[in-house]
Amino acid sequence: MAHPAQLGFQDAASPVMEELLCFHDHALMIVFLISTLVLYIIIAMVSTKLTNKFILDSQEIEIVWTVLPAIILILIALPSLRILYLMDEINDPHVTIKAVGHQWYWSYEYTDYENLEFDSYMVPTQDLTPGGFRLLETDHRMVVPKESPIRILVSAEDVLHSWAVPSLGIKMDAVPGRLNQTAFIVSRPGVFYGQCSEICGANHSFMPIVVEAVPLEFFENWSSAMLEDA
């Protein structure tokens, strides 16, 4: 969960998000080293009065500033490609959920069950219970079992939306007429908040996402209760 004056990412709640945090630190260190080197060169050039008017070209320097950036790009690309493959890998999901974006709410359908589907609207500020988060709470949460592979299919009914939960490292575009998919594993129980991350109209800021991860037996009890109420 984000908090005021937060400078870093939210706490990771999935293996993919943990990998993304490590990759961020890896890339940030490379950027820091490059920035330090460039700053040192600029200061050295400005602070000295010595100049060399006779070096018009240097084969060695040209080799260095061609090979070195290539090596740096490879060091960034390899871990990035690894994470991309991890995000695309879907092996035997325990639960498949279809999320459809509407103006301006989300609807969820648990495709492994015959009639388990519901709409999820933002709770208005005046209806919040003590401890609720303004503009983030919903009347129905997307409940998933923890430590289980979850496949989510994302689409939209009207305009472009985007289903995003930062703690899980997920951001998937919801496109009308197109079905995108991704997978995730929630590594610990908890409630994780997200929002539509694609400007989709006047009430774009008022279609939050709430994912609640619970133990498997709690999920089975919840799904049974939802089916009885359907």
UniProtKB/Swiss-Prot annotation:
Membrane-traversing stretches: 15-45, 60-87
Positions of Cu cation A1 binding: 161, 196, 200, 207
Compartmental location: Mitochondrion inner membrane
Taxonomic superkingdom: Eukaryota
Positions in the Mitochondrial matrix compartment: 46-59
Signal peptide region: none
Positions annotated to bind Cu cation A2: 196, 198, 200, 204
Binding site for Mg(2+): 198
UniProt similarity note: Belongs to the cytochrome c oxidase subunit 2 family.
Subunit structure: Component of the cytochrome c oxidase (complex IV, CIV), a multisubunit enzyme composed of 14 subunits. The complex is composed of a catalytic core of 3 subunits MT-CO1, MT-CO2 and MT-CO3, encoded in the mitochondrial DNA, and 11 supernumerary subunits COX4I, COX5A, COX5B, COX6A, COX6B, COX6C, COX7A, COX7B, COX7C, COX8 and NDUFA4, which are encoded in the nuclear genome.
Role summary: Component of the cytochrome c oxidase, the last enzyme in the mitochondrial electron transport chain which drives oxidative phosphorylation. The respiratory chain contains 3 multisubunit complexes succinate dehydrogenase (complex II, CII), ubiquinol-cytochrome c oxidoreductase (cytochrome b-c1 complex, complex III, CIII) and cytochrome c oxidase (complex IV, CIV), that cooperate to transfer electrons derived from NADH and succinate to molecular oxygen, creating an electrochemical gradient over the inner membrane that drives transmembrane transport and the ATP synthase.
Protein name: Cytochrome c oxidase subunit 2
